[in-house]
């Protein structure tokens, strides 16, 4: 928000930073949860788009949620904090994998999608419930056999619509679901040389959805060779 921002450093430490009118750092406080240690070098965390006081952080195969990060005062401290954190009682099925990407919904609120380091995608339908199950929505066919999920993007107008990006070279890179992960379609279109994902296509890294009007949307994909745009998602025929 306008009073403070969050940033992380390598190894997963998350810092709440207070900024002054000139955008300069006035004070800071470390806020990542006590008990969380299995962080990646660059560790995923996101703010909830509906309630910015809710924070989601991955830790290996686990998910941590802070239900009200605003209560942690900024006093230049550098210790992990216990306030309002819980670890979801469930975790991704293969604990040798780790959560590599997070995507949260606007409408309805508090749905969370998780991507992993080895092709799997999960859905949590109530992220504020510490016992909410992680539903495996990975298709039995179609996804890369061992792809790395680098981005999960949820349509802010409809939480049933979600994109998954695989950043590996030589695999099909972009999938889209309109039914909360029940089915998936390939939508990388002309960004792939072949429909299998083989060939000289770039590595896709991220996707962002920008609603324009009630009937139009802009989609942006970040790749190893630049930024691409489309306004129409049309399965294999999508033109970026």
Regions found by a protein language model. Give the residues of each.
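Loop/turn-rich, solvent-exposed surfaces of beta-rich toroidal or solenoidal domains
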Residues: 157-160, 165-172, 191-232
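Surface-exposed loop and turn segments in beta-propeller and other repeat-based domains
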Residues: 27-37, 78-95, 137-143, 189-199
